[in-house]
Amino acid sequence: MVVSQNWIAIDERTWRYEDGGVRFFLLAGAERALLLDSGMTVHNARELARQLTDLPLSLFNTHCDIDHVGSNDEFDEVWVSPMELVHPKAPHDSRRVRPVWDGDVIDLGGRELEAIALPGHTPGSTALLDRASGMLFSGDPIQRDGRIFMFGPMRSLAAYIHSLRRLSLRKAEISSIWPCHATCPVDVDTIDELIAGAEAIERGEASFTVDEVHGNPVRACDGGPSILLCDPA
């Protein structure tokens, strides 16, 4: 079988797929494999994953923005935070939803992944921490050289700051961070740098420019490692 050149091996059990401006991940254990998000432009993520593993395959959504759910319809079951079900792109057939709460552990067989809730970017944004390796698959909330969407009715800067502060308390457990956008991987110090940047935005002290994203006026605020796209003042 020909393996797509978009697949990049991280180690012998972990891969990332570069899908334009977004990426998704494939994690394998001894018994099962897990796809973290399902792409933006691709609609055959299951088939792509089969290029690398024949283990039973499940899908986990870090959140349900449109650039993370491109192949969701390929899967009968989706692991996702119930807090994310308000999202218009979330699976609304309850039979397809396997709820994942903060602190839940997904065991792939000798490889445990802990769900860490990171609300703010979206209500149900959730990262997965590989407990053995310390690799944190962060979704969108943690980025370096990226543009983090914080505008619109479902997003909350205050919740985002709280999530990052909570995550910062666990930095000793994290060896590297693997975001779905921009630079990858990033170092653990990115968490505290984003906290400082977001707090400056909250205080009204961060510089910004006026921009437009998908027809929405936004403030493109200096958030330290990344730009935070916030609602107009």
What are the language-model segments listed below?
Residues 118:
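Short, contiguous alpha-helical
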Residues 32-34, 58, 111, 134-135, ...:
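Structural motif
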Residues 3-51, 128-139:
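Conserved beta-strand hairpin/beta-sheet module of binuclear metal-dependent hydrolase folds
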Residues 45, 156, 160-167:
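A general structural detector for well-ordered alpha-helical segments in enzyme core domains, enriched
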Residues 40-114, 144, 196-204:
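Active-site HxH/HxHxD metal-binding segment of metal-dependent hydrolases
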Residues 37-40, 64, 121-122, 134, ...:
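Active-site metal-binding loops of divalent metal-dependent hydrolases
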Residues 113, 122-160:
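A contiguous binding-surface segment within folded domains or other stable secondary-structure elements
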Residues 165-233:
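Accessory terminal helices/loops
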